[in-house]
């Protein structure tokens, strides 16, 4: 019985820490997005190419609706979008990707 109780306590601690980390990553992603991306992508829009927004339907249509796709785009850039791979740490880029995907899924 003690072993079962210990197992549930460990699971509870682990899942709460994962949720806190994810929330912190979204906060960090929001800060990085505001500082580096919002000039062109305020509120999920696109000031340069208006049809390629960060809204859920546009991300899906352009096959950019995954963390990997967004991370790749941010790191390497494409067309008018500059590459941020040399300017931002990988962790920061991943936080931005998580933030963008989360915001798009929740309607900005």
UniProtKB/Swiss-Prot annotation:
Single GO BP term: photosynthesis
Post-translational modification: Binds 1 heme c group covalently per subunit.
Subcellular location(s) of the protein: Plastid, Chloroplast thylakoid lumen
One MF term in the entry's GO annotations: electron transfer activity
Signal peptide from the UniProt entry: 1-23
One Pfam family per UniProt: Cytochrome_CBB3
Major place of residence: plastid
Keywords, comma-separated and alphabetical: Chloroplast, Electron transport, Heme, Iron, Metal-binding, Photosynthesis, Plastid, Signal, Thylakoid, Transport
Function: Functions as an electron carrier between membrane-bound cytochrome b6-f and photosystem I in oxygenic photosynthesis.
Stated name of the protein: Cytochrome c6
Species per Swiss-Prot/TrEMBL record: Gracilaria tenuistipitata var. liui (Red alga)
């Amino acid at each position: 019985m003690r072993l079962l109780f210990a197992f549930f306590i460990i699971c509870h601690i682990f899942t709460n820490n994962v949720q806190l980390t994810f929330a912190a990553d979204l906060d960090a992603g929001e800060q990085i997005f505001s500082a580096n991306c919002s000039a062109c992508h305020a509120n999920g829009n696109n000031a340069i190419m208006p049809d390629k927004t960060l809204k859920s339907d546009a991300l899906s249509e352009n096959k950019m609706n995954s963390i990997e796709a967004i991370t790749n785009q941010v790191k390497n850039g494409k067309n008018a979008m500059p590459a941020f791979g040399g300017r931002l740490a990988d962790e920061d880029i991943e936080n931005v990707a998580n933030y963008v995907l989360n915001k798009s899924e929740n309607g900005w």
